[in-house]
Amino acid sequence: MIFSEAWLKEWVDPQMSSDHLMERLTMAGLEVDGFSSVASNFKGIVVGKVITVEPHPNADKLKLCLVNDGVEDYKVVCGAPNVIPGMKVPFAKVGAEIQVRNEEVPLKIKKAKIRGEESSGMLCSAEELGLEDKSDGLLAFPDEFSLGSDVRHALELEDLSIELDLTPNRGDCLGMRGLAREVGVLTRSECKEPDFYPAQIKHKTELQIDILAQDQCPRYLGRVVKNIDLNQTSPLWLREKLRRSGLRSIDPVVDVTNYVLMELGQPMHAFDYEKLHGGIRVRMAEKNEKLILLDGKEVTLEPDILVISDHEKAVAMAGIMGGLSTSVSEKTKNVFLECAFFSPLAIAGKARTYGLHTDASHRYERGVDYELQHLAMERATEILISIVGGEAGPITETLGNLPKESSVDLLFANVKSLLGIEIPPDEIKDILTRLGFVIEKEDEDGLTVGVPTYRFDISLEADLVEELVRVYGYDNVPKTSGFFSQTLATKEPEKMVPHDRIRNSLVDLGYQEVVTYSFIDPKQSDLILVLPDAQKISLQNPISTEMSVMRSSLLPGLVDAYTHNVNRHQERVRVFESGLVFLKEEKEIKQEHRVAGLISGDRLPRNWVNEKGLSDFYDIKGDVETLIALGNSVEEFSFDNSEHPSMHPGQCAKVTTPTGVEVGFVGALHPRIGQSLGLDGSIFVFELSLDVLQNGELPRAQALSKFPEVSRDLAIVVSSEVPAAKILANVRQNAGDYLSNSRIFDVYQGDGVEKGKKSIALGLTWQHPSRTLSDDEINKIISSCVNGLHEQFNANLRD
């Protein structure tokens, strides 16, 4: 939300500097995201009055103006199309300074000759004062502005536009009234509401209002205002307040509804009364019902969308955007004003379904005070009639199922228990009362308070405690108090591999850590499957349609990060992420901690030493083995050929523990994924269970032997279908207790080896702890290994 500090001070004056105010708001949970001056840094511009306007003798588009500043007259050449005698305008006299956009040094106004005529100053547009991005003519001032007065003072431009980043639970602060109430509480300042006057009823015309969706629309108010004149323009004070709140002026009707939105936090909408047929019905959309919105976009409405309709068709998406067919135009003479309370659940996420986000939907999603509608209707009517004239009819109100007022119990002992400090009961009552809570019951142990209708976020005792400490001041809570001083660290088991150690190991291997959203595009979820029958977990209130499904794998985020980098000409990418994935099993949603990595491009960074070599399956498999080795014996884990819906056939391995628990998978991403994303080259990935990786084994200490090692090489021929890991496992099983190292150092297929078979060369090393092993002992062990390989795999020694 963006608000004007000067407008806020019309409601409440905290008697503090802007910096102090912004700090106080931030510390109370209303985070200030930024601020800016409401105008450019101009000097010496005063209110002037155009006395006469004559054609320029040497230029058709220029005019000669006589301008008075309250003291004397000045000749000024002006090219604005809207300049007329009698209007009051910003007058930059000789010596004034104007800040030109994108220029560091201001423009100093000098006396000049323009097409042969002397000009002693400049008449300014709103654009030249930094009040608008684009202006078509001079800025016209109201008649009450005093001639010669400084424009900065006349327009109260010593003001800031402050932007708040409000959390979703603080919808009550999305209007000046709620924000002023909050500032008043935080600073112990009096909040003064402007005077609101009910409109005089001048006619009896009403529209019948029927609420067919009573849970979704608990309250709907309407009023017909007749004989308005939309050739009028919104007054400068109204346009300025909207501008400083981040809204542009459109026409008097829209400006008034936007003003009430910003002042009270209540969205409103205006229909052209003559374009409505029969009456108003608030209902759910019919299947495949269509509506052309105000922006000209046609949408097909889903049955869960709440709509406003007349007796013929839908005319608005309730709480989101109006329809084009009943929109107000310059020809409109009679308007129907709508002011309603829509349930937050009825509006939440619906705008994003259609790629929309409006000020109205933003507020309705968070909750609007359901007692505010009468006040907002009267306020809008009062301002509208003061601008465009007209005659107000009676307010027509229809009720659905209004929310029930709620109460919350608060025990004083629990305040101390949760905060670690003791706030006196009288101060607790004072804070809650100033926040708008009503003390319904009290005794020596605690209170029962009634929750204000504008606070949808208060339902628990802990919510009240949060309100107390927020107003009491987080900075007033001693650092050594209660919970905040406790160290709740628990000692992890010695065999547990710390999460940070796994992350740091990947960084040491050249990976860069990324953090991606847990919400992904459904198309991504379909493209990169974890399991063929995995059920998608859709969000009821997604940020956008591209972020509407919970991730069941970390790979979509990594592929996104890879695509982002490749599109920016990064040829070598190594990224990893650790985080939660979400799996649906029957009716339950299960969370799993995982770590995943992706590599592509060169094996090593290019330089004069490293020759170009592309990453392959064995590079990423080696990285996975490094992670396993942090807490376990790599030799005991198995990498077996596997099929995976997202992986390349023949280049995917399932990783399992010695007890058969599946850790995850490693391999090449399926080529169809790269092709669908427009990516060239091979992409290698892994995804592993973080819980299994962290569950290591205690290291077994062993004394170093002082006796010599004995090494032998063994080359066998075996079927090419036999995994190398199984051969190593068989050898280790038959190689005796003193085998200290075993590895495969060569695999060969080709001349001299029968088709369908492969030659595998193993390097074996033995070492006895207390003596030297003899050749006879080693030869017997070799024979045992060869026999074991022959029996299990029909392997033979290579000639």
Residue ranges, per PLM feature:
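Phosphate-backbone binding interfaces of nucleic-acid-interacting proteins
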Residues: 1-203, 336, 355, 359, ...
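A carboxyl-terminal module marker
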Residues: 2, 27, 434-437, 588-590, ...
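Glycine/proline-enriched, intrinsically flexible loops and inter-domain linkers
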Residues: 5, 23, 63, 192-289
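Conserved mixed alpha/beta core segments that line enzyme active sites in large multi-domain catalysts
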Residues: 47-77, 239-240, 257-325
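Mobile "lid/hinge" segments at catalytic clefts and subdomain interfaces of large enzymes
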Residues: 115-124, 128, 137-140, 152-153, ...
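Extended, well-folded interaction surfaces typified by the phenylalanyl-tRNA synthetase beta subunit core
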Residues: 178, 408-572, 712, 765-767, ...
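Terminal amphipathic helices with adjacent charged low-complexity linkers/tails
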Residues: 187-212, 388-415
